[in-house]
């Protein structure tokens, strides 16, 4: 079956569908959180656990993917995971209180976590020729973009017109189609015999990633390590990671196979997928809030801007396979450079920017991400042995997810902390003794002799301080893209052939 082109195309379509439905579940729920909060009589802090626990379950289950595939095979694991994902998705839509929803969201994350790494491993094993593999990665990458891009808009419409429950119901037809595709077209892989699961390593790593994810997700809300709970989680994180590290060094059967990291391109690929995770998701978190709250864009304009970013990614996926034939490192460098330029330009935004200007910056940023992803996927797995592919793709996506989580948390910290500094500095300038405030233009904007004028000036100072905070985060974003470029020289252009 794997030797003929037509079945391989079907495999690619099925795996793209599997990937899209899981990634849609990650983004579609966000738009319905306010409505869910009211319907389930939850506080903002309580409803935030709907997202947090799903991310924790995903982080814990992802490293287990390789062992699951080795023990039961990719077909069985896919069937179980897609089935479990479909059932928990349906159950999420039927709850009447918060507690069962949290339980089902944990199940949704745990069943969904292996889907993306297994899908990538199946495609990589089906398309072994470098040129065809590049095209396949491009097509699969489009499912990563199109699904999560459409889902929030469709989910928001369904939640507004009907109920928040429809954000889960709309996933069911797609997940059932994915299950039928897996049952009909995915065959068993020839993976090596599984060794006994290293429970010490798995439990230690699970505790570490759980603590880390909760710290990242709730740290800013709880004032980081000033909070006793966050401090305790940090201590547990360090201890459990130390235990995992020592177990990996001295165990005869470590949970994460050390052979993975003897592959030079794979190890470098992990570094660059961390960078990709940093750069790909962060703008979709920062831009909507900034544009809506401090520039005054309506939801429709923000949706258009995000759609244009998806267009840029789509164009990158079209171009990257051709450029990668010349040298994948050049394509990656061009992608990082485009992302860096978009960050530099974003750092010039102000409250008067037009939708057109922000849109073309989004296209450039999306183009860079598209140019980076395909060659990154190619060089990372070019020499990895087939029996390590499931472990490799699982670790690959775990690192990508943590790149996103860490950089988002860092950028939010930069925005909030520098906004306070900016507010203090601007407030010092805006005082009755500043001669600039006595000029005619200033008097027209802010009448300091009235309470309304003082309130208006204070609000303007706050808005400008936060805006400068966002600009600082865009500078950090640009540096995150440009600084790693020289390290691309360490990647082998034509690595030796891998051995099974």
Question: PLM features: residue spans?
Answer:
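A residue-level signal for alpha-helical anchor/packing sites in multi-pass solute transporters
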Residues: 122, 126, 157, 185, ...
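Helix-loop-helix hairpins in multi-pass membrane proteins, especially solute transporters
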Residues: 62-200
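Hydrophobic/aromatic positions within or immediately flanking transmembrane alpha-helices
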Residues: 12, 48, 74-79, 101-102, ...
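Hydrophobic/small/kink-forming positions within alpha-helical transmembrane segments
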Residues: 56-60, 90, 145, 149, ...
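Hydrophobic transmembrane-helix bundles of small-molecule transporters
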Residues: 138, 160-272, 276-279, 305, ...
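12-transmembrane solute porter fold
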Residues: 8-24, 29-33, 40, 44-53, ...
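Hydrophobic transmembrane architecture of multi-pass small-molecule transporters
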Residues: 395, 399-493, 499-500
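Membrane-helix interface/capping residues of multi-pass secondary transporters
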Residues: 44, 74, 98, 130, ...
């Amino acid at each position: 079956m794997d030797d003929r082109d037509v079945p391989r195309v079907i495999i690619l379509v099925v795996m793209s569908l599997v990937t899209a439905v899981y990634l849609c579940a990650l983004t579609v729920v966000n738009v319905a959180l306010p409505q869910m909060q009211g319907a389930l009589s939850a506080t903002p802090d309580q409803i935030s656990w709907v997202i947090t626990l799903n991310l924790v379950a995903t982080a814990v289950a992802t490293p287990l993917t390789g062992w699951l595939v080795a023990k039961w095979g990719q077909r069985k694991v896919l069937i179980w995971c897609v089935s479990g994902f479909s059932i928990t998705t349906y159950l999420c839509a039927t709850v009447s209180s918060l507690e069962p929803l949290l339980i089902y969201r944990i199940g949704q994350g745990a069943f969904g976590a292996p889907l993306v790494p297994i899908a990538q491993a199946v495609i990589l094993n089906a398309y072994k020729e470098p040129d065809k593999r590049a095209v396949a990665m491009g097509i699969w990458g489009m499912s990563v973009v199109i699904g999560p891009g459409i889902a929030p808009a469709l989910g928001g419409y369904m939640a507004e017109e009907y109920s928040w429950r429809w954000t889960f119901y709309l996933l069911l037809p797609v997940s059932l189609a994915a299950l039928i595709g897996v049952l009909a077209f995915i065959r068993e892989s020839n993976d090596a015999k599984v060794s006994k699961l290293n429970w010490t390593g798995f439990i230690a790593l699970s505790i570490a990633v759980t603590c880390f994810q909760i710290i990242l997700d709730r740290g800013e809300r709880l004032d980081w390590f000033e909070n006793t709970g966050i401090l305790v989680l940090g201590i547990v994180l360090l201890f459990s990671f130390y235990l995992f590290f020592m177990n990996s060094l001295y165990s005869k059967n470590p949970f994460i196979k050390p052979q993975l990291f003897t592959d030079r391109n794979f190890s470098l690929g992990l570094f660059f997928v961390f960078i990709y995770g940093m750069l790909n998701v962060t703008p979709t978190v920062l831009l909507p809030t900034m544009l809506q709250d401090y520039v005054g864009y309506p939801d429709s304009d923000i949706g258009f801007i995000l759609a244009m970013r998806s267009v840029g990614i789509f164009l990158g996926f079209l171009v990257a396979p051709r450029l990668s034939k010349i040298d994948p490192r050049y394509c990656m460098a061009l992608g990082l450079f485009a992302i860096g330029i978009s960050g530099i330009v974003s750092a010039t935004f102000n409250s008067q920017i037009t939708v057109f200007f922000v849109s073309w910056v989004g296209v450039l940023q999306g183009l860079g991400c598209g140019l980076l992803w395909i060659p990154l996927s190619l060089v990372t797995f070019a020499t990895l042995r087939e029996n390590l592919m499931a472990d490799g793709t699982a670790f690959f996506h775990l690192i990508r997810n943590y790149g996103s989580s860490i950089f988002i948390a860092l950028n939010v910290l930069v925005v909030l902390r520098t906004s306070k500094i900016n507010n203090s500095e601007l407030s010092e300038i805006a005082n009755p003794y500043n001669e600039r405030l006595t000029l005619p233009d200033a008097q027209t904007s802010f009448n300091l002799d009235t309470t309304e004028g003082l309130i208006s000036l204070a609000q303007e100072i706050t808005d400008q301080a936060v805006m400068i905070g966002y600009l600082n985060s865009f500078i950090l974003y640009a540096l995150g893209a440009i600084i790693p470029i020289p390290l691309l020289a360490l990647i082998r252009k034509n690595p030796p052939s891998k051995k099974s």
